[in-house]
Amino acid sequence: MPELPEVETLRQDLAREVVGRKIKAVSVANGRSVRRHPSAKHFRALLEGRTVKSVGRLGKYLLLTLDNGDTLVVHLGMSGQLLRVKSVKDPKPKHTHVVITFTQGGELRYVDPRTFGELFVSTPPMKSDGTPLSPVSGTAGGDGAAIRKAVPELAHLGFDPIEDLMSWDRFGYLLHQHSGGIKALLMDQSFTAGIGNLYSDEMLYQAGLRFDRPADSLTATEVRRLYRAIVETLADAIKHRGSSLADEQYRDLFGEIGEFQGSHQVYDREGQPCRRCRNNIVRVKTGGRSTFFCEHCQV
């Protein structure tokens, strides 16, 4: 599943490619991709004739703000891709479910083999304070709060390490309200938005913490180390345009793979030597997912 760095890479590319462009037509080949709407016709009517004013992101969600104040929200799910093509004559990949055509030419295509992702148009509430925010994100500063109020469907999302501002000690206070394993908490989208199985492993390795350490057991030094690892890992992955694994399901807006997979320290490196201590990286199954870590460097 694309995580925050992959979605942020798409956001940056979309901001350059589609802002200021008017939507000429929308076609929907699979209604499951727009399942929040009563029909594909309803979804199309909300988009056709509208102009994209800006592109944002919160957690794993892309947000295309339209000229009437509505927002086209895109979640890629497990296998979704957004592809920008200059010519409508370019062959469409298999599993192309939604196509947005612009008046100035070219298309934006949503491709999703497993159809767990979705697109929907959100209308801002009449009252800006009508939807309660997540207990975690509600205490944060930055741009995230404004996004949650404009798109109430995302009000449940927790702290976004890029869009929200939060001190490390406040982050530590929130961690200490939970006794479960730290990896599961980082992946809980109501606690931290945008982190998934891959980057949680990388962050915990950088912080020297085991995946199953109780969150409320972290010392102040460990909290600070984890906070720094979260911010630095995400920034580095964004700089390298995200991670594409062996299946190469993640592609950027132009169909190119990411580059950060070459910098993975533990993820998908079972049996390979740890780059710090040279002991082998271990893989265990937790909650139906694979977790990769170093038994010697992470405590």
For each predicted feature, which ranges?
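Phosphate/anion-contacting hairpin/loop surfaces
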Residues: 72-194, 199-206, 214
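Basic, nucleic-acid-binding surfaces and adjacent catalytic neighborhoods in DNA/RNA-processing proteins
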Residues: 22-43, 169-299
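Surface-exposed binding/hinge segments that line
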Residues: 1-125
